C-alpha cells in the first residue's frame, strides 16, 4: 500500500493536523532520538483508533503504538507503516475511591488528581514520567510501589479493534513486565482502586519522593529513566558505578555522572549511540561481575540504512 494513499485516507478519518507524513519521532520521545514515521496519527477517541486498526488490517499495514515515549528508544531508521500516538486520549474520572484513567493520561497527573481527592495509593507514581498505558504495559513502579498494587481492571482493544475488559489477574504482572509485551492488545483505560487518606499526609509523602527523585536523577538532560531492570539482590546503577562506567560516552550519549542507572543525551545523540552504549555497559558489567543486565527500556523501529 502506498503511504501517500494511507495518509490521504486517514486524513479523512482524523481531525485536521492529527495525521502527518514523515514525522520525526525524536519529537515524540523523552530521549530525543528516532527517525521518521511513514504515517503518524494522533487519534482523539476510541472510535478513531478502531478506524485506524480496521484500515491497517484490511491492507496489511503494520501499526505501532506509542504513549508519551518516556521508556522507549526508536531506532534512527524510524518506523514503517502507521505509528499511532495515544497522547490525546487523556480522560480521567473520579468516583468515590475509584479513578478511571485513559491510556494517554500522564501517570504523574493521575497521582496529583488522587491527591486532590484525598486518595492514597498512587504516591509512588508522582515522579514516573510515563503514560497510564505505558505504566500498565511495564508494571511501572518506584519507591516500593507498583501499578499492579492499585489496578483492578482495564479496558483494552484487540488487534481486530474489539473492546474487552480484563481483570488484574489477566495482566500476569511481574517485575517491570505484563502480558502486553506478548500480545497485540492496546491498553485504553485503567481502573484504580485507592483508599481515603489525609491530604497533608499524602502531599508530604509525594513531596518527599519528588525531592529524592530530583536530588538523585539527572533530570536536566533527556533520558529514558532507568535503562536496566534491577538484577536479583542487587542494583543496576551500583554495578555500573562499580564498573567505573559513569561518564562513559559513545557519540552524544553518556552514562550519567549523577545516577549510573541512567543514560543521558548530552550532545545530539542518536538511537544507535544509546544502543551501542547499552551493549557496552552490559558487556562490561557481565565481564566484571558475571551479571547480565536486562534492559527495561524498549527498543523499536528500523536501523538506519
UniProtKB/Swiss-Prot annotation:
Pathway field: Cell wall biogenesis; peptidoglycan biosynthesis
Subcellular location: Cytoplasm
Superkingdom as given in the UniProt entry: Bacteria
Keywords: Cell cycle, Cell division, Cell shape, Cell wall biogenesis/degradation, Cytoplasm, FAD, Flavoprotein, NADP, Oxidoreductase, Peptidoglycan synthesis
Biological process terms in GO annotation: cell division; cell wall organization; peptidoglycan biosynthetic process; regulation of cell shape
SUPFAM superfamilies per the UniProt record, alphabetical: FAD-binding/transporter-associated domain-like, Uridine diphospho-N-Acetylenolpyruvylglucosamine reductase, MurB, C-terminal domain
GO cellular component terms given for this protein: cytosol
Pfam families: FAD_binding_4, MurB_C
Cofactor(s) needed: FAD
GO molecular function, one term: FAD binding
FAD-binding PCMH-type domain boundaries: 33-197
EC numbers for this chain: 1.3.1.98
InterPro entries: FAD-bd_PCMH (IPR016166), FAD-bd_PCMH-like_sf (IPR036318), FAD-bd_PCMH_sub1 (IPR016167), FAD-bd_PCMH_sub2 (IPR016169), MurB (IPR003170), MurB_C (IPR011601), MurB_C_sf (IPR036635), Oxid_FAD_bind_N (IPR006094)
Entry-linked HAMAP family: MurB (MF_00037)
Alphabetical list of PANTHER family matching this protein: UDP-N-ACETYLENOLPYRUVOYLGLUCOSAMINE REDUCTASE
Role of this protein: Cell wall formation.
Protein name: UDP-N-acetylenolpyruvoylglucosamine reductase 2
Amino acid at each position: 500500500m502506498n503511504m501517500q494513499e494511507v495518509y490521504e485516507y486517514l486524513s479523512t478519518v482524523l481531525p485536521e493536523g492529527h495525521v502527518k507524513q514523515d514525522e520525526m519521532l525524536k519529537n515524540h520521545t523523552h530521549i530525543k532520538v528516532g527517525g521518521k514515521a511513514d504515517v503518524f496519527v494522533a487519534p482523539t477517541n476510541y472510535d478513531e483508533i478502531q478506524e485506524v486498526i480496521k484500515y491497517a488490517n484490511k491492507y496489511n499495514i503494520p501499526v505501532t503504538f506509542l504513549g508519551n515515549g518516556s521508556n522507549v528508544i526508536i531506532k534512527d531508521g524510524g518506523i514503517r507503516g502507521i505509528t499511532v500516538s495515544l497522547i490525546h486520549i487523556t480522560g480521567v474520572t473520579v468516583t468515590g475511591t475509584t479513578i478511571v484513567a485513559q491510556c494517554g493520561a500522564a501517570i504523574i497527573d493521575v497521582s496529583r488528581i488522587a491527591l486532590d481527592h484525598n486518595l492514597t495509593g498512587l504516591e509512588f507514581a508522582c515522579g514516573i514520567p510515563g503514560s497510564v498505558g505505558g505504566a500498565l504495559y511495564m508494571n511501572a513502579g518506584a519507591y516500593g510501589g507498583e501499578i499492579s498494587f492499585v489496578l483492578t481492571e482495564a479496558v483494552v482493544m484487540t488487534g481486530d479493534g474489539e473492546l474487552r475488559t480484563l481483570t488484574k489477574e489477566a495482566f500476569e504482572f511481574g517485575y517491570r513486565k505484563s502480558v502486553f509485551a506478548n500480545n497485540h492488545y492496546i491498553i485504553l483505560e485503567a481502573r484504580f482502586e485507592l483508599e481515603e487518606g489525609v491530604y497533608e499526609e499524602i502531599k508530604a509523602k509525594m513531596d518527599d519522593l519528588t525531592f529524592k527523585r530530583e536530588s538523585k536523577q539527572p533530570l536536566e538532560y533527556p533520558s529514558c529513566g532507568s535503562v536496566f531492570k534491577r538484577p536479583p539482590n542487587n542494583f543496576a546503577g551500583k554495578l555500573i558505578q562499580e564498573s567505573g562506567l559513569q561518564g562513559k560516552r559513545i557519540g552524544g550519549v553518556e552514562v550519567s555522572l549523577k545516577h549510573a542507572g541512567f543514560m543521558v543525551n548530552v550532545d545530539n545523540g542518536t538511537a544507535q549511540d544509546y544502543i551501542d552504549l547499552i551493549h557496552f555497559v552490559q558487556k562490561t558489567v557481565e565481564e566484571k561481575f558475571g551479571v547480565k543486565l536486562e534492559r527495561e527500556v524498549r527498543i523499536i523501529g528500523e536501523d538506519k540504512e
